[in-house]
A protein has these predicted regions:
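Short secondary-structure capping/turn micro-motifs that flank functional sites
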Residues: 37, 57-58, 152
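Short, well-structured alpha-helical interface segments that form or flank functional binding sites
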Residues: 32, 69, 129
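A structural signal for alpha-helical segments
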Residues: 25, 66-69, 122
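Short, low-complexity N-terminal intrinsically disordered segments enriched in polar/charged residues
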Residues: 2-39, 43, 47, 51
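A solvent-exposed, acidic/Ser-Thr-rich amphipathic alpha-helical stretch
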Residues: 46-112
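A beta-strand edge to alpha-helix "cap/lid" segment located at domain peripheries
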Residues: 2-18, 82-167
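Short, charged/polar micro-motifs that form catalytic or ligand-binding hotspots
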Residues: 39, 64, 124
């Protein structure tokens, strides 16, 4: 029995299942984008980091950093604003909530805690919320816009970021 010969309820069930599978796969892809942001930035893996953004994406980091547009703006943010300040960073995202507005657009919100050390060895703790607009183009999900709201950005006096000693 071909697709044209299937009863309408079977066709509707298959269409519904295909839509649900697509959403599950999309959710996994979007979680990977959020993780690749952290991994790419923290490990200085530029190719991984830039691959998550649409060419004309907007990255609103907010004060004290600013807003940046497109791959060139994002490159400027990373290499001229952020990396020159930070010796190392460790981003941890959690509580990712995704809402699909249509099959090719989604909205996401997650929290991030980032511990980092500046080039002058001051350990900082940052807590923020990322709000993302994701878009799928040519079957690939990417970030179209990320807005950052920083809740706190504090130094931790006396803290050091050193690996454990091997004894």
């Amino acid at each position: 029995m071909g697709a044209r010969e299937m009863p309408n309820d079977v066709q509707a069930t298959i269409a519904s299942l295909m839509q649900r599978i697509d959403e599950l796969e999309s959710r996994a892809n979007l979680r990977d984008l959020v993780s690749d942001y952290c991994i790419g930035f923290d490990t200085h893996d530029w190719d991984r980091f830039i691959s998550i953004w649409h060419r004309d994406a907007i990255w609103e980091i907010g004060p004290p950093f600013g807003s940046f547009e497109g791959h060139e703006g994002i490159r400027k943010a990373v290499f001229e604003v952020l990396y020159p300040v930070w010796r190392e960073t460790h981003h941890l995202t959690t509580n990712l909530r995704l809402t699909f507005t249509d099959p090719n657009r989604a909205h996401g919100t997650c929290n991030v805690d980032c511990m980092g050390a500046t080039k002058d060895n001051v350990v900082q703790m940052i807590s923020a919320t990322y709000t993302d607009d994701f878009e799928r183009s040519e079957k690939v999900w990417k970030i179209a816009k990320r807005s950052v709201v920083i809740h706190y950005f504090n130094s931790i006096p006396g803290a050091q970021m050193t690996p454990p000693s091997s004894s």
